[in-house]
Design a protein with these regions (language model features):
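A short beta-loop-alpha structural element at the N-terminal edge
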Residues: 37-41, 103
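Tandem CBS (Bateman) regulatory domains
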Residues: 2-33, 47, 67-68, 72-123, ...
């Protein structure tokens, strides 16, 4: 019953065989409700949103809803902000274009490799496997590690 609970919690069909991390995809463990900011969000609003969030990186979308990058709190926290600056700067001015992201069809093992290579990153945006401009979720390093532990316990 533990295996079935694991499957259902990840949204994996019961006929899909899980033997290794290669059998679990990022889309199975990602969080689908993602807070995003529009590219024209003012700097002071960005600070407000980040300060009330558990995430330190925020996905930025353009007016069409396409994923264009992330704003990373570590990049902006040291900026000395005067009131005029905070009204002039918007998200698209400080966005990191083409950020590190995962594709929804990547395996759990591939996701772990990305997090191992970038140990300073705790969350990654997940984009559609076919359309890399479509943001479909977010996955944390803890989500990946927790799924690995559950898989290891299941196999022992």
């Amino acid at each position: 019953h533990v295996v079935e609970h694991f499957r259902s919690s990840l949204g994996i069909p019961s006929h899909h065989k899980i033997k290794s991390a290669a059998d679990i995809l990022v889309q199975h463990i990602m969080r689908k409700n993602v807070d995003t900011m529009c590219e024209d969000t003012h700097f002071n609003e960005i600070l407000r949103l980040i300060s009330h969030s558990k995430y330190d990186r925020f996905p930025i979308v353009n007016k069409e809803g396409d994923f264009i990058g992330v704003v990373d709190y570590s990049d902006i926290r040291d900026l000395v902000v005067d009131p005029a600056f905070s009204q002039l700067v918007v998200a698209k001015d400080i966005v990191k274009p083409e950020p590190l992201s995962l594709h929804s069809d990547q395996t759990l093992g591939e996701a772990l490799d990305v997090f191992r290579s970038h140990s300073n990153i705790t969350y990654l945006p997940v984009v559609d496997a076919e359309n890399h401009k479509k943001l479909v979720g977010i996955v944390s390093q803890n989500d990946v590690l927790s799924s690995f532990r559950t898989l290891e316990n299941k196999n022992n």
